[in-house]
Amino acid sequence: MRVLGIESSCDETGVAVYDTGLSGSAALRAHAVYSQIALHAEYGGVVPELASRDHVRKLLPLVRQTLAEAGLGVGDIDGVAYTAGPGLVGALLVGAGVARSLAWALEVPAVGVHHMEGHLLAPLMEDDPPEAPFVALLVSGGHTQLVAVDAIGQYRLLGETLDDAAGEAFDKTAKLMGLPYPGGPQLARLAEQGTPGAYRFARPMTDRPGLDFSFSGLKTQVLMAWRDSDQSEQTRADIARGFEDAVVETLSIKCERALEAAGTNVIVVAGGVGANKRLRARLQQMAERLGGRACFPRPALCTDNGAMIAFAGALRLQAGQYSPPKVDVTPRWDMATLPAV
């Protein structure tokens, strides 16, 4: 089954073709992503109306490009998957409208995919994928969650952020230190030049039971340290390193607790912050110490992309789960309400 996947929940336009007749990483026939970073940079953040309009301009050309790279014609598609939520309602509607129109014209089934389920399942596209049960750390600009995965489609929320998501904390911290948008990746690169231990910040909520997160206080600590410093380039790098170390250690501590609570030693990490090198290394070390595995998607599939939507959609289409023939999106959507596959 060849499934066309469309992602348009925020500021990336993603399209991919996933072929269930192939195995491992080869099943991803082609994928392409267009990022709107340059469009939103002058505003310091995503402008929803501009995001929607840019999806309108870029989506169909990206579909044509992806099909060409896969060596397929539009008539070779057996199903269409699209992000139905959560996300920006206007941006979601662009992708849903194109997906439903293609499915209707081709007379093939279509299914709306939960954006975060797409992230969660992305590591399963790699060679030697993990098998449930496992714990997933979903860590991005909009979400920081620990989820127990009993089976595909059977999810239990173990913990989540009570305020800022980890990726959001990276971006906001970078902005208050004067780094350009998008700040998170810039801060991570700067942290590589920082001196370990020069600044040590709190590891929020690790001194108490539970699996929830809070990063707003950490952001305030960084702000105070930056204001009281000489604000030199080396100090900027040292503070960035201290902040990154605090976030990475906090996530690692909570992940280990979540594995113990869920009774497994396999951790799956997905979402934009999952591309962070220091986080990957720390969780890999933790999993090996526990005799388990830490599984990640390739860095290109950590950020929003059509590949994860095509894959998640293919699993549901193969299970006979189709969406009603209408353009419908769910900007706020609890992943625990999804049906099992």
Swiss-Prot record:
Fe cation binds at H115, H119, D304. It comes from the Bacteria. It is found in: Cytoplasm. The keyword Secreted does not apply. Its EC number is 2.3.1.234. CDD domains: ASKHA_NBD_TsaD_bac (cd24133). One of its GO terms (molecular function) is iron ion binding. Belongs to the KAE1 / TsaD family. Required for the formation of a threonylcarbamoyl group on adenosine at position 37 (t(6)A37) in tRNAs that read codons beginning with adenine. Is involved in the transfer of the threonylcarbamoyl moiety of threonylcarbamoyl-AMP (TC-AMP) to the N6 group of A37, together with TsaE and TsaB. TsaD likely plays a direct catalytic role in this reaction. This is tRNA N6-adenosine threonylcarbamoyltransferase. It comes from Stenotrophomonas maltophilia (strain K279a). The lineage of its organism: Bacteria, Pseudomonadati, Pseudomonadota, Gammaproteobacteria, Lysobacterales.
